[in-house]
Swiss-Prot record:
It comes from Burkholderia cenocepacia (strain ATCC BAA-245 / DSM 16553 / LMG 16656 / NCTC 13227 / J2315 / CF5610). It is an enzyme of class 2 (transferase). This is Putative phosphoenolpyruvate synthase regulatory protein. Its EC number is 2.7.11.33, 2.7.4.28. ADP binds at G151, V152, S153, R154, S155, G156, K157, T158. The lineage of its organism: Bacteria, Pseudomonadati, Pseudomonadota, Betaproteobacteria, Burkholderiales. The keyword NAD does not apply. Pfam families: Kinase-PPPase. Transmembrane segments: none annotated.
Length: 271
């Protein structure tokens, strides 16, 4: 029987779930995850306790609860459940209040922007920009890009671009490097004016072949020798052009995005 883990929040639960994944990944154990977002009333808090207690009875062991409930009364209700309750706000906010000699707002949902805030609008603009400039489909307004990711097809450019846009409000375009570029020995002409914005992604040729075979099995496009050729040529071009790059083979999208932000000095987010 897998241990049951509840993610309880008065908002979307994204913060609590991210934290929970980071903690639980330290254990060689699978868990059954139950998300309980928008617990923004006492009635919902009591209903959540019922769910937690039912899981404890079913599992024959108490549940584990990660909570980011801001309302102290709701939090106290959840803490009376048959569970190990890990209260992230109490653990971190109270010591910060003492250190800063300030009281926190204790307002629900402050960690996520509302639709009418400038931060939210910036993020939506960045997402629209990244979608419009995915895989080199448009050169229009490329000068507005914060970063332009380059690399061979299926090296991780699209998911990284969208993650940068959604998570950080970064206008990230991406552009493929194709065999014709390698034959010319030059970057695509559309990228020439923006060399300072370029960041490259590479990948292990064998892994690239596996990914491409899922899309076009048995094709030259997916053949190991072709993948080796494209990767070797792409990396040589990036070195020649002075483009910073990394291998996406063993890195998560989060790690790739964080490295890019550091390398191109886009670590500008404030709170």
């Amino acid at each position: 029987m897998l241990p049951t883990v509840f993610i309880v929040s008065d908002g979307t639960g994204i913060t609590a779930e991210t934290f929970a994944h980071s903690i639980l990944s330290q254990f060689d154990q699978k868990f059954r995850l139950v998300r309980v977002p928008f617990v923004d009333s006492l009635d919902k808090a009591y209903a959540t306790v019922e769910k937690i207690n039912e899981a404890a009875v079913h599992d024959g062991r108490r549940a584990i609860v990660f909570t980011t409930l801001v309302d102290s009364e709701s939090n106290d209700i959840v803490k009376r459940s048959n569970a190990l309750v890990l209260d992230m706000f109490q653990r971190f906010v109270e010591p910060l209040e003492q250190e800063l000699e300030l009281k926190s707002s204790h307002a629900m949902g402050r960690g996520h922007q509302n639709a009418d805030t400038e931060e939210y609008k910036t993020r939506i603009e960045a997402i629209n920009f990244s979608l419009a400039h995915d895989d080199g489909q448009s050169n229009r307004n490329l000068s507005e890009a914060d970063v332009i990711l380059v690399g061979v097809s299926r090296s991780g450019k699209t998911p990284t671009s969208l993650y940068l846009a959604m998570q950080y409000g970064v206008k990230a375009a991406n552009y493929p490097l194709i065999p014709e570029d390698f034959e010319r020995g030059k970057l695509p002409s559309a990228l020439s004016p923006y060399s300072e914005k370029l960041f490259g992604l590479s990948i292990d040729p064998q892994r690239l072949s596996e990914i491409r075979n899922e899309r076009r099995p048995g094709s030259k496009y997916a053949a190991p020798e072709n993948c080796r050729y494209e990767i070797n040529e792409a990396e040589a071009m990036m070195r020649r052009e002075g483009i910073k790059w990394l291998s996406s083979t063993h890195k998560s999208i989060e790690e790739i995005a964080t490295t890019i932000l550091q390398e191109i000095r886009l670590d500008r987010q404030s709170y």
